[in-house]
């Protein structure tokens, strides 16, 4: 029987080296886990995008570069997090995540919008712009 690896490589690199490794940016999106959820998402001010994903998920791998681009483009306006659902099934269950990738938007620790599936970048940008727009 194979032993389960407790953390993804990007999570380990981020924990030990921060968002850069050897001067190279590892990720624009911050890994989040059950243990850091309340601090990183629940108590975050402003808009937070959480990408619920898994290593084995093909569509998740397709949307990952788009999520990274959005994290760069909206740096300072949007906090982008990534949650591995295999490593953190409790959080995925808490928010009823049944399909991945699911991109869930939070404000004040509460979900405010959701996008399911590997959708085009424009759909995600439209959702972000709408959520960042001042209330009319």
Q: Predicted segment positions?
A:
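Short, Lys/Arg-enriched N-terminal segments with co-localized hydrophobic residues
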Residues: 5-26
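Conserved helix-turn-beta segment immediately C-terminal to the redox Cys motif
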Residues: 45-47, 64-83
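Short pre-active-site segment immediately N-terminal to redox-active cysteine/selenocysteine motifs
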Residues: 46, 52-56, 99
């Amino acid at each position: 029987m194979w032993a389960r690896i407790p953390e993804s490589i990007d999570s380990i690199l981020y924990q030990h080296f921060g968002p850069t490794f050897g001067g190279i940016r590892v990720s624009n999106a911050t890994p989040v886990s059950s243990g850091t959820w309340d601090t990183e998402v629940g108590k975050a001010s402003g808009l937070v995008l959480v990408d619920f994903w898994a290593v084995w998920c093909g569509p998740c791998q397709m949307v990952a570069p788009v999520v990274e681009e959005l994290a760069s483009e909206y740096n300072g306006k949007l906090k982008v997090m990534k949650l591995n659902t295999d490593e953190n099934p409790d959080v995925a269950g808490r928010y009823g995540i049944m399909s991945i990738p699911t991109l869930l938007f939070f404000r004040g620790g509460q979900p405010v919008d959701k996008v399911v599936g590997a959708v085009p970048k424009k759909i995600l940008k439209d959702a972000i712009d709408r959520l960042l727009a001042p209330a009319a």
